[in-house]
Regions:
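Bacterial N-terminal signal peptides that target proteins for export
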Residues: 1-11
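Bacterial N-terminal signal peptides
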Residues: 11-19
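Sec/Tat signal peptide C-region and signal peptidase I cleavage site
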Residues: 20-26
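A contiguous strand-loop segment
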Residues: 27-124, 144-204
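Cysteine-dependent hydrolase recognition
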Residues: 37, 132-138, 156
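Second-shell loop/turn segments in exported
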Residues: 117-118, 126-135
């Protein structure tokens, strides 16, 4: 009887630990507007509860490119090339998830209906870093991101993006239109000044 109980207990604990591990590998964003912070700064957090992301801090140097240069998009999750897009003439310096103009972008994944996952060229991670290299403000980043998926297609599942500059903080949600349909469905909302917000793997 004790052996059976021990085996059942072990199986139960393993099941619970696997469920907890699955739940823990998630992302959380906290958003603070300038009117809600003590010193008038905007700031956002990006907690990715996954050991595979510990210690990663990318540096992308500002650069100038000749007209006609192409940029290869690499899927952030798998490392697989997805295709090429036209490079802009000048890109900004990016450290981690913030660029030289204090524009910062983070995300949490909410997934959504699987039939809406697209087959485009740009995944959610690449969308973040390309926008940081090409934008000076949150509003410009939203324009860049939505223009890119409209032209080249959106590869990922549903995402909530946090986009902040020294003046404004925004949340933008995006999901694909499905197989064979280029572009994405998206909505962007500015967090009112003097307010805070948060999202963690759930669509609004």
């Amino acid at each position: 009887i004790m052996k059976r109980l021990s085996k059942s207990l072990a199986v139960g604990l393993l099941t619970v630990s696997m469920a907890l591990a699955s739940t823990a590998e998630a992302c959380t964003n906290f958003l603070v507007t300038k009117g809600a912070s003590k010193d008038g700064s905007t700031f956002i957090t990006y907690a990715a509860d996954s050991h595979t992301l510990y210690g990663e801090l990318y540096y992308r140097r500002a650069a100038t490119f000749p007209k006609g240069t192409m940029f290869t998009v690499i899927d952030w999750d798998s490392g697989r090339p997805l295709g090429q897009i036209e490079q802009v003439e000048h890109t900004y310096s990016v450290v981690g998830n913030m660029n030289e103009h204090q524009l910062a972008i983070s995300e949490t994944t909410y997934g959504g209906r699987p039939e809406l996952e697209g087959q485009g060229v740009i995944d959610y991670g690449s969308l973040i870093y390309i926008a940081l290299q090409r934008s000076k403000s949150a509003r410009e980043a939203i324009q860049v991101m939505t223009d890119l998926v409209q032209e080249y297609g959106y590869y990922s599942s549903g995402e909530s993006f946090t986009i902040a500059d020294p003046r404004e903080v925004w949340v933008m949600e995006m999901i694909g239109k499905g197989v064979g349909v280029k572009g994405a469905v998206w909505v962007a909302v500015r967090i009112p000044d003097d307010c805070i917000s948060a999202h963690a793997n759930q669509a609004r």
